[in-house]
Amino acid sequence: MAKKYFGTDGVRGEVGQFPITPDFVLKLGYAAGQVLVQHDTDQKPTVLIGKDTRISGYMLEAALVAGFTAAGVNVVQTGPLPTPGVAYLTRALRLSAGVMISASHNAYSDNGIKFFAEGGVKLSDEVELEIEAKIDGEMKTQPSARLGRARRISGADDRYIEFCKSTFPSHSDLRGLKLVVDTANGAGYGVAPKVFHELGAQVVSIGNEPNGYNINEKCGATYTKTLQAAVLQHEADYGIALDGDGDRLMMVDKNGQVYDGDSLIYVIAKARAREGINIGGVVGTVMTNMAMEIALKEQGVDFCRAKVGDRYVLEQLNQRGWLIGGEASGHILCMDKHNTGDGIISALQVLAALQTLNQDLATVCADWQPYPQTMINVRIQKGQQWQEASKDVLAEVEKELEGKGRVVLRASGTEPVVRVMVEARQADWAREGAERIAAAIGGI
């Protein structure tokens, strides 16, 4: 059954436009609370709510609290905290569920609601459908004796900081390193600099003055120019950029070179292989560069691809029992450290890996150079049989590129467009292949 409200990462949209309105979020909290009460019959459920720094977070948090307590669910509120911190505390405090109010890397004018089940894992499709079935029903507030309570908890930041530090090797530290840490004026502004400082690094903080409106604005993992300039200005060893909710990571070296999620995953995997740690393999996505796949296999590390989206990477990791995965966008999963993507913990794993390899980022990543890619968006008509029209040319191009390139065709889920991506060892091979396939699709 198709979901009506939940997308791939919870409920998200523009603030003030359905579904990110206080009245809908009230119903969402009430519906989720009803499901929790039905599932947790032994005692009154407790939910943890965290948020990023968007001005709309106050409004949406109040609506959620009202919905949950009306359904008979207790609520604890942390204030601003990264998404992976909410997941961790949901597990560590043995709570019934966790909720993060954030729209991740989007502008302040957007917001969203993301749920975690008991144990800090993302909700299953079945539970999301169960919640959706109750959203449109009538709200019947519990009798006063069964209403939930809400309270703010102190020390959530400190507990998450200690957890992050515990993922770094106990026999080592970060003394001697100068780091610029860009927290995107987002959820990590209060915790990320402290983690690296307490492990011994000299920390320069930027993107750490949120005002409700400047989250992700020319800063953070989706805009690294500010970090690159700061690293050069302060003559730092590395720059670390998180996104608005703290689950993505980009890094910059002392020369201002940017390293995306693929490069950082390779560094972690190579170090684990060098240490003889069995990670099983690495899960990327259909968009992961083929050159990285080849480089990993040269290190003796297996590789497979999932659909685009960190939830699909996580599914593959769980199914295969592998430990490392992620995307070029900076979502990195280290399953032996945390059960969700965590920008701070991922940065610590990269820094630990560089110590293990006794090399800097540029040297390790020189093992492979991304294959050139050509991407073409082809507009199509509704109902156009583009797969049939392009299948012969697609087969020809794939045969020509066998072992030295690949093709990815993806229909957009939001607009009438087919995205053609061809990557190959040589740029002209990629360009020619993409143009041939795009022409065969036809478009409008």
From Swiss-Prot:
Alphabetical list of InterPro entries matching this protein: A-D-PHexomutase_a/b/a-I, A-D-PHexomutase_a/b/a-I/II/III, A-D-PHexomutase_a/b/a-II, A-D-PHexomutase_a/b/a-III, A-D-PHexomutase_C, A-D-PHexomutase_C_sf, Alpha-D-phosphohexomutase_SF, GlmM_bact
Signal peptide from the UniProt entry: none
Cofactor descriptive note: Binds 1 Mg(2+) ion per subunit.
Catalytic activity: alpha-D-glucosamine 1-phosphate = D-glucosamine 6-phosphate
Domain of life: Bacteria
Enzyme class: isomerase
Purpose: Catalyzes the conversion of glucosamine-6-phosphate to glucosamine-1-phosphate.
Name this protein carries in UniProt: Phosphoglucosamine mutase
Gene: glmM
